[in-house]
């Protein structure tokens, strides 16, 4: 009788362990990797964008060292995206699009959560300072040439 009771108890325990084991993979499958969370954030940025073309992840900075493995806590991210040849209206995933030659580059910073269900992100993207500075310089030079170019040409003709 005692052996039968122990066997029944062992069977219940095994059943509970089996059920617990089946439940755990589904819970862990809901956690995204750092890269997957950033890719999702980039996809959502494309969906909300009003720009003509899609942007694709170009470079992802490594995740910061954190002891906290809680997938609900926002993780800081930093990455760069580059304009692709695919129009935003296309149904093609950005990851399948080629980068546009001389396409616009954007630096993005913010936070993402690794929880696949919540999937929260707060990302801000902007052109890199050096690109903005060069573009501003180019506009000033073009404006100066347009404004003072004819005068400079007259001076060169007179002097030459």
Curated annotation (Swiss-Prot):
InterPro entries: Cathelicidin-like (IPR001894), Cathelicidin_CS (IPR018216), Cystatin_sf (IPR046350). The lineage of its organism: Eukaryota, Metazoa, Chordata, Craniata, Vertebrata. Its main location: secreted. Disulfide bonds join 86-97, 108-125. Keywords: Antibiotic, Antimicrobial, Disulfide bond, Secreted, Signal. Broad spectrum bactericidal agent. Belongs to the cathelicidin family. This is Cathelin-related peptide SC5. Thermostable. Residues 1-29 form the signal peptide. It is found in: Secreted. One of its GO terms (molecular function) is lipopolysaccharide binding. Residues 30-131 form a propeptide. One of its GO terms (biological process) is defense response to Gram-negative bacterium. Pfam families: Cathelicidins. One of its GO terms (cellular component) is extracellular space.
């Amino acid at each position: 009788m005692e052996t039968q009771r122990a066997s029944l108890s062992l069977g219940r325990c095994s059943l509970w362990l089996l059920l617990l084991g089946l439940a755990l993979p589904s819970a862990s499958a809901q956690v995204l990797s750092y890269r997957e969370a950033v890719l999702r954030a980039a996809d959502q940025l494309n969906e909300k964008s009003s720009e003509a073309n899609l942007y694709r992840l170009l470079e992802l900075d490594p995740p910061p060292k954190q002891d906290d493995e809680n997938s609900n806590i926002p993780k800081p991210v930093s990455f760069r995206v580059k304009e692709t040849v695919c129009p935003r209206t296309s149904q093609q995933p950005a990851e399948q699009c080629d980068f546009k030659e001389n396409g616009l580059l954007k630096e993005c910073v913010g936070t993402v959560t690794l929880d696949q269900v919540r999937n929260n992100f707060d990302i801000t993207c902007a052109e890199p300072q050096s690109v903005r500075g060069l573009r501003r310089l180019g506009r000033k030079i073009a404006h100066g040439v347009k404004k003072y170019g004819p005068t400079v040409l007259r001076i060169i003709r007179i002097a030459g």
